[in-house]
UniProtKB/Swiss-Prot annotation:
Keywords: Cytoplasm, Proteasome. CDD domains: proteasome_protease_HslV. This is Proteasome subunit alpha. Transmembrane segments: none annotated. Residues 231-267 are annotated as: Disordered. It comes from Mycobacterium ulcerans (strain Agy99).
């Protein structure tokens, strides 16, 4: 007599979690962080058409890591939900927390009821309405529907440990856009170096996708950063660093010159 194959619920959940985590880890990394002007998204993404970062509504942005077809389906569903609610009630009634809760419920249902969980991790970010001073909100939603409110930054996809470590060491609150971009790019490079061999090139602007939620814009806060803009911002940061490094040298030379002149005058 043959017995039907049985698997305990705990083992089934463990196997689903392992499947989802491995799928997310195979993807490229994404960083979202708060800065002085709003929220910055930076993703390792060489594709120009398959985008990981998107606008959900006026003041709400979206970023994801994992399987593109799965998180793109969630992205489109979030946009439809936001548009419907904003039309039926008021545009201010659409919030980042509300959309994050919808995504958490959807992913939780998929994880427990469907045969295969979604191999995705999401970030929903919101900036305050124009004229308000509320801090940006960042929400992380994982494959099983878990949701967390992150105060400063979110790291998803790929090898997250070196990127998170780099951000903990370099992140500063209320940084300007060039500084925030440099922090995010250097953190992504730390994760890329962890996975690549020595002969592979350093992660460049051509392999990056970036956008911001600009809290200083009156209505639609989302704005993509082109690759030329990225290059300009990073060069601005480099020139700022070089100027700061030259200042102490000049002051020391000035001190030496001043001492010399005093000695000459005494003679």
């Amino acid at each position: 007599m043959s017995f039907p194959y049985f698997i305990s619920p705990e083992q089934a959940m463990r196997e689903r979690s392992e499947l989802a985590r491995k799928g997310i880890a195979r993807g490229k990394s994404v960083v979202a962080l708060a800065f002085a002007g709003g929220v910055l998204f930076v993703a390792e993404n060489p594709s120009r058409s398959l985008q990981k970062i998107s606008e959900l509504y006026d003041r709400v942005g979206f970023a994801a890591a994992g399987k593109f077809n799965e998180f793109d389906n969630l992205r489109r569903g979030g946009i439809q939900f936001a548009d419907t609610r904003g039309y039926a009630y008021d545009r201010r009634d659409v919030t980042g927390r509300q959309l994050a809760n919808v995504y958490a419920q959807t992913l939780g249902t998929i994880f427990t009821e469907q045969a295969k969980p979604y191999e995705v991790e999401l970030c929903v970010a919101e900036v305050a309405h124009y004229g308000e001073t509320k801090a940006p909100e960042l929400y992380r939603i994982t494959y099983d529907g878990s949701i967390a409110d992150e105060p400063h930054f979110v790291v998803m996809g790929g090898t997250t440990e070196p990127i998170t470590t780099a951000l903990k060491n370099t992140y500063t609150e209320n940084a300007d856009l060039p500084d925030a971009l440099d922090i995010a790019v250097e953190a992504l490079r730390a994760g890329s170096a962890e996975n690549s061999s020595n002969d592979q090139p350093v992660l460049g602007v051509a392999s990056l996708e970036a956008a911001i939620l600009d809290a200083n814009k009156p209505r639609r806060a989302f704005r993509r950063l082109t690759r030329s803009t990225l290059e300009t911002l990073l060069q601005e940061r480099d020139s700022k660093e070089s100027a700061e490094s030259e200042e102490p040298i000049e002051s020391e030379e000035g001190k030496k010159t001043g001492k010399k002149s005093d000695a000459d005058s005494s003679d």
